[in-house]
């Protein structure tokens, strides 16, 4: 008999769903409990490692350790020890499959959707294998629950009403890498190549001048900085084009200003055409950065 209906793995710090079982239950009551689970996932950091919320037909159980939590929607006939044994098994399987770095860097929902096959396998095992075959594991969990009972949540703790959770506006935590940019264009690739070339020229001239100045005099510090500052600005322009960054316009203007001022300062060491080339590449890169927009957010993969 099926007593575990749905399971998912989420990141504790922001409630980002990492993987979930593909469910085939679409009753109104079940969908309501899915919404409750999603609401609760956003606030797991507020609760201890284990907790349960029970209703008439369904119950939610969660178990977390570190930055990974496993959550399940079960029938009310499902013993708590079995639910937490299932969640602990799932937690071990997930953390054995993915390291903490991958989990921490995940930026989109269901980044580890392929783990669904493991969830289904473990879920089937707990739903259809007799409890006598899991006696050892269940006894261990039962002892732990006696020593440290799980937090008991009310249905109000999982409610979502008009987009407000318990009278508080939900925080939508979304790390910067979660922003996905539009595909790179041919002109954008050209601007990257030219920018890297300008950065290399600035670095080579700056290092060469620094070596010469150390042997001769310390009067060339201004010229050295005028080469190295635009070098850093060119590299940062490449970063701004490839990745999203907050306050992008302000950073673009600042980098463009550094490059223009640096090249104007080098008027005695570069001819007019060289200066115009460097400034022209900087303007092209700035234009490409500002015209490359964010992609529209994708839906939650239909899980």
Curated annotation (Swiss-Prot):
Pfam family, any one: Longin
Longin domain boundaries: 8-119
Lumenal compartment segments: 205-223, 270
Swiss-Prot/TrEMBL keywords: Endoplasmic reticulum, ER-Golgi transport, Membrane, Protein transport, Transmembrane, Transmembrane helix, Transport
Compartments (UniProt record): Endoplasmic reticulum membrane
Keyword Transmembrane carried by entry: yes
Cytoplasmic-facing ranges: 1-183, 245-248, 292-303
Membrane spanning residue stretches: 184-204, 224-244, 249-269, 271-291
GO cellular component: endoplasmic reticulum; endoplasmic reticulum membrane; membrane
Its membrane topology: Multi-pass membrane protein
GO BP annotations listed: endoplasmic reticulum to Golgi vesicle-mediated transport; protein transport
InterPro entries: Longin-like_dom_sf, Longin_dom, Sec22a/c
Signal peptide: none
Expression (tissue specificity): Ubiquitously expressed.
SUPFAM superfamilies with a match to the protein in the record: SNARE-like (SSF64356)
Keyword Transport listed: yes
Family the entry assigns: Belongs to the synaptobrevin family.
PANTHER family: LONGIN DOMAIN-CONTAINING PROTEIN (PTHR46258), VESICLE-TRAFFICKING PROTEIN SEC22C (PTHR46258:SF2)
Function: May be involved in vesicle transport between the ER and the Golgi complex.
Protein's name according to its UniProt entry: Vesicle-trafficking protein SEC22c
Lineage: Eukaryota, Metazoa, Chordata, Craniata, Vertebrata
């Amino acid at each position: 008999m099926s007593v575990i209906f749905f399971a998912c793995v989420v990141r504790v710090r922001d409630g980002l769903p990492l993987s979930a079982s593909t469910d085939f239950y679409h009753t109104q009551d079940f969908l309501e409990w899915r919404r409750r689970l999603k609401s609760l996932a956003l606030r797991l950091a507020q609760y201890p490692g284990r907790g349960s919320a029970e209703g008439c037909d369904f119950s939610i159980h969660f178990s977390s350790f570190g930055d990974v939590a496993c959550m399940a929607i079960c029938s009310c006939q499902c013993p708590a020890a079995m639910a937490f044994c299932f969640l602990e098994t799932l937690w071990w399987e997930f953390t054995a499959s993915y390291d903490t770095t991958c989990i921490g860097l995940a930026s989109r929902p269901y980044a580890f959707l392929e783990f669904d096959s493991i969830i289904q396998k473990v879920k089937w095992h707990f739903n259809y294998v007799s409890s006598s075959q899991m006696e050892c594991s269940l006894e261990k969990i039962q002892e732990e629950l006696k020593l440290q009972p799980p937090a008991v949540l009310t249905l109000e703790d999982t409610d979502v009403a008009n987009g407000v959770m318990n009278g508080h506006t939900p925080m939508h935590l979304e790390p910067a890498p979660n922003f996905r940019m539009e595909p790179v264009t041919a002109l954008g690739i050209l601007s990257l190549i030219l920018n890297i070339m300008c950065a290399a020229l600035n670095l080579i001239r700056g290092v060469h001048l620094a070596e010469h100045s150390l042997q001769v005099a310390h009067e060339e510090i201004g010229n050295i900085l005028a080469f190295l500052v635009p070098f850093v600005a060119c590299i940062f322009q490449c970063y701004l084009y490839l990745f999203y960054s907050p306050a992008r316009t302000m950073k673009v203007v600042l980098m463009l200003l550094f490059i223009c001022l640096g090249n104007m300062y080098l008027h005695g060491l570069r001819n007019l055409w060289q200066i115009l080339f460097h400034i022209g590449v900087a303007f092209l890169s700035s234009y490409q950065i500002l015209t490359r927009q964010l992609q529209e957010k994708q839906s939650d993969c239909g899980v």
